[in-house]
Amino acid sequence: MSSDSSGSGNSIGRRDFLKSMFGLGGLLEASEAQAKSGTGRTIFFWSDLKTGQVGFPTGFMVEAGLPGSVMKIVAAAALLEESLISPNETIDCKGHVTIKGARINCLVAHGKVDAVHAIAHSCSVYFATASKTMSQSLFFDYAQKFGLNSAVGSVKSGLFPKPEKSTAWPYVLGLSPHLHPNALQLLRLSAIVANRGDVPYLHSAEESAQGKARFNLEFSDMTWGRLQQGMQLAVREGTAHKLDPGNKLHVAAKTGTAPLGKKFQSWLTGYFPYDAPRYAFCLGALNGTSSEVAVPRAKEFLFATEWP
């Protein structure tokens, strides 16, 4: 469903394919209202992982929307921490799978993939299959652990639903119209992975962080390691492989694409350098897919900035 790709040679075919995927369950219609209210602009936020200070070179308009495959980070954490799948267990992706009557597609058949490669290549078949026994309550519990229902500084949370007795895969793939995290929450998600759960209070330069509690989340070293490896591999060979040519900044990231009316919105969130994380970032684009817009625009911001 939300299987991202950064290939550009088949952009027209990819767009048609995405439309066919995202048409399931009326998701296109469900996102029409947001499309009409969307600005079509690109937003970019970054944060210092030592001080918690947030920079916003595109302005402080905090968009929220369907997160797409970024939610696979949350799902991977739940799957690994709850032992719903073992770290090295593989699932054979043949390009599609049917879950409770819904056909879920990947852009390509990924073959046998484990958790790390499923994150890197955004394999929807892997996550939909591995999450068949995951309840919405469990997924939301982990989404809450990542702060997707809580404010970031003075900015309120985006839309967060109550669990129902239904399948979790629309949330796992970031395609439910009832879950709309905002850009700062997705920024914090990457900061959490980068710092293995210990993140300073995120704030603007005008806001004091004195006395503010740090964000803390405890997972096993195994889980943190798989999440970090997956995001690193996404930039080296996966859905964000055009983000950091030559591995100059040592970026780790996760892409996400979702419907916005009859078009697409996309996200890219990550951190760098992955061997000693100092910065996290999030880019949101309301006018295209991750391969067409989010990755190239994030690359521009990352390489145009003089990082201390």
Locations of regions flagged by a protein language model:
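Conserved active-site-proximal loop/helix segments of enzymes involved in bacterial cell-wall
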Residues: E89-I119, L187-P245, W307
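Active-site-adjacent helix/loop patches that line small-molecule binding or acyl-intermediate pockets
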Residues: T90-H96, L107-P170, S176-P177, P181-L184
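Active-site-proximal helix/loop microenvironment
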Residues: G55-V70, K112, V152-A213
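Short, well-ordered beta-strand elements
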Residues: W267-T269, P277-G288
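Active-site SXXK
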Residues: F44, G52, E63-N88, A118, ...
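Short, Gly/Ser/Thr-enriched beta-strand-loop segments that form substrate-interacting elements
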Residues: H241-D275
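N-terminal secretory signal peptides and thylakoid transit peptides that target proteins
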Residues: S3-G25
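A short, well-structured edge-of-sheet supersecondary motif
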Residues: A35-G59, F281
